[in-house]
């Protein structure tokens, strides 16, 4: 499932915390991650991701999903990009 497919199935106002995981096929030990929050964003909702994020991010494969509670709920999404 891609990030776009997942986010399209969410409520538009759900908070999404997206983490990019970079992996190397040639070196299975290589593993790096960082939060994906484009410059200037203070909040990342499903609606915002669909409307403003570039296709190269939306097409990334979802690795894991973590749903957290709270008043509105938050979706933690790990996506993977292979670097080689």
Where are these regions (language model features)?
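Acidic, low-complexity, intrinsically disordered interaction modules
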Residues: 20-79
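Short acidic DE-rich linear segments
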Residues: 82-84
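Short, structural beta-strand-to-alpha-helix junction motif
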Residues: 1-4
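Short loop-to-beta-strand transition segments
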Residues: 15-19
């Amino acid at each position: 499932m891609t990030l776009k497919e997942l986010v399209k199935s969410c409520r538009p106002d759900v908070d999404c915390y997206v983490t990019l995981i970079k992996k190397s096929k040639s070196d299975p030990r290589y593993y790096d991650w960082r939060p994906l929050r484009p410059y200037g964003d203070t909040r990342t909702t499903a609606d915002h991701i669909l409307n403003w994020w570039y296709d190269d991010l939306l097409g990334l494969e979802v690795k894991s999903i973590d749903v957290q509670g709270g008043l509105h709920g938050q979706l933690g999404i790990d996506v993977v990009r292979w670097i080689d």
